[in-house]
Amino acid sequence: MNSPIEKLTRQLGYQFQDDELLNLALTHRSANSKHNERLEFLGDSILSFVIADELYHRFPKVNEGDMSRMRATLVRGNTLAELGREFGLGDYLKLGPGELKSGGFRRDSILADAVEAIIGAVYLDSDLEVVRGIVLNWYTSRLEAIKPGVSQKDPKTRLQEFLQGRRKPLPVYTVTNIKGEAHNQEFTVECDIAGMDKPVVGRGTSRRKAEQAAAELALEQLTNG
């Protein structure tokens, strides 16, 4: 292995037996017909399970709703993108010319997908207990900081409560674009809010994720503006 990849494996805290799994996890679909989306699918499920299991044992008296909200906070795209930046993943991603030109190595969705793909790759290279230890090590500070309660509500819920508390109409979400094939789509959603000059746009791999992204941006604009 060359030294840049060795640096990445040190950051990840895991030495791969099969280097090709790591290479595949870092390969975006824009770069090659063999890419990281199957690994991402696997890693997404493993991450959700590992975090759910940890929350269940860490918070024995917390109800299902709060645990679901805490898990959503920990596994959402921007949290994964933060992890990706901490690892310096953008320097190692294999992207096609178009994505490189448009700064894909900085994009939250691409970084988040790569983190999930790496989780899938670690699992295939080892086993569930090893990948559990790796993931929990990555999440140490976030697991220590997270608490049950209102702050874990998803963005759509928080936006709705924000508007209701000010006696304003509820937001209207409209899908304005869907691109890609059925198994690999990107949804674009506009969130219209009374009193805002223009709709807020969110994107995601499902309608729900796009709506949540739009709601998060709308909340930022409303609270910071």
UniProtKB/Swiss-Prot annotation:
Gene3D superfamilies: 3.30.160.20, Ribonuclease III domain (1.10.1520.10). GO terms for cellular component: cytoplasm. Its cofactor is Mg(2+). Its main location: cytoplasm. Keywords: Cytoplasm, Endonuclease, Hydrolase, Magnesium, Metal-binding, mRNA processing, Nuclease, RNA-binding, rRNA processing, rRNA-binding, tRNA processing. GO terms for molecular function: double-stranded RNA binding; metal ion binding; ribonuclease III activity; rRNA binding. The keyword Membrane does not apply. InterPro entries: dsRBD_dom (IPR014720), RNase_III (IPR011907), RNase_III_dom (IPR000999), RNase_III_sf (IPR036389). The active site is at 44, 116. Mg(2+) binds at residues 40, 113, 116. It is found in: Cytoplasm. Residues 154-224 form the DRBM domain. Residues 5-127 form the RNase III domain. Its EC number is 3.1.26.3. One of its GO terms (biological process) is mRNA processing. Homodimer. Digests double-stranded RNA. Involved in the processing of primary rRNA transcript to yield the immediate precursors to the large and small rRNAs (23S and 16S). Processes some mRNAs, and tRNAs when they are encoded in the rRNA operon. Processes pre-crRNA and tracrRNA of type II CRISPR loci if present in the organism. Belongs to the ribonuclease III family. PANTHER family: RIBONUCLEASE 3, RIBONUCLEASE III. This is Ribonuclease 3. It comes from Vibrio vulnificus (strain CMCP6). The lineage of its organism: Bacteria, Pseudomonadati, Pseudomonadota, Gammaproteobacteria, Vibrionales. The gene is rnc.
